Amino acid sequence: MLLVIDVGNTNTVAGIYDGKKLVDNWRFSSDRSKTADEFGMFMNSMLNFSGLKKEQVTDIIISSVVPPVLVPLCHMCERYFNIKPLVVGQGLKIGLQLRYENPKEI
């Protein structure tokens, strides 16, 4: 299963996919003071609440506009899921060419 996490300035939204099917999703505050362990306990609780086990997660993707939250989330993925997440952000090569005068403004 794929765990996706999107960190916004106010809220973070996480979802779990089985193939193309969204199994469940959760919204929580983008708290900059949370540790990797706090994120890990929360994610484990949410998975359990949905009848899932962390061992079912095989891949993780994270996008974030809040850099201070990204580091503990990545540590959480490695510690609690033993998975190095794919971080979607600036510099990720996805095979698309941006033909804007200033692509950084997008």
PLM regions: where:
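Residue-level preference for the first positions of well-ordered beta-strands
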Residues: M1-L2, D59
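Short glycine-rich, Thr/Ser-proximal phosphate-binding strand/loop in the N-terminal lobe
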Residues: L2-S45
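Short amphipathic alpha-helical segments, especially helix-boundary/capping motifs
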Residues: Y17-K21, N48-L52, Q90-K93
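Conserved active-site "lid/cap" helical segment
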Residues: F42-T58
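Short beta-strand-loop/turn "lid" adjacent to the catalytic site in phosphate-handling enzymes
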Residues: K53-I106
